[in-house]
């Protein structure tokens, strides 16, 4: 019982870091390895797959994931109406913004008025890896 109290007291005293394992109060130079992660990964799984080359790191050395928003992975949707509004969408397979005529109703979020808006939102298409599901190591 006394041991359990000491262990729970140590757990309270441990300082946590976002990216590194915490260190204990008795031996500050030795890391304490938690049973489960301290925090979930700041980048969701889809971000880790779709992130482009050249991620940056914050002051603690944690990667800051700059990911393509979800709307960029949506398929082209012209809609059921018969108007012909010039629009752009991000072609996920080709990794670039492409022109299409939108019907005028029921769009999805992968529908941009200008190529600039498309590139700004889904951007870095020209600088992306040729295959998004292969993780390169440098």
Curated annotation (Swiss-Prot):
The UniProt record lists the keyword Lyase: no
Tissue expr: Prismatic layer of shell (at protein level). Expressed primarily in the mantle with highest level in the mantle edge and lower level in the mantle pallium.
GO cellular component: extracellular space
Subcellular location: Secreted
Disulfide bonds: 72-122, 81-105, 97-118
A Pfam short name: Kunitz_BPTI
Any GO molecular function: serine-type endopeptidase inhibitor activity
Region forming the signal peptide: 1-19
Domain of life: Eukaryota
Alphabetical keyword list: Disulfide bond, Protease inhibitor, Secreted, Serine protease inhibitor, Signal
Keyword Ubl conjugation: no
Domain BPTI/Kunitz inhibitor intervals: 72-122
Protein name: BPTI/Kunitz domain-containing protein 1
Native species: Margaritifera margaritifera (Freshwater pearl mussel)
């Amino acid at each position: 019982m006394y041991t359990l109290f000491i262990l729970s007291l140590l757990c309270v005293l441990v300082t946590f870091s976002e990216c590194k394992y915490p260190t204990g109060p008795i031996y500050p130079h030795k890391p304490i390895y938690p049973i489960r992660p301290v925090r979930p990964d700041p980048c969701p799984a889809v971000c880790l797959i779709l992130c482009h080359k050249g991620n940056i790191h914050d002051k603690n050395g944690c990667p800051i994931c700059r990911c393509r928003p979800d709307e960029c992975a949506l398929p082209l949707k012209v809609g059921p109406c018969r108007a012909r509004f010039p629009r752009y969408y991000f072609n996920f397979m080709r990794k670039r913004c492409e022109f299409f005529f939108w019907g005028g109703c029921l769009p999805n979020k992968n529908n941009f008025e200008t190529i600039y808006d498309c590139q700004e939102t889904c951007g870095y298409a020209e600088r992306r890896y040729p295959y998004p599901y292969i993780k390169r190591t440098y």
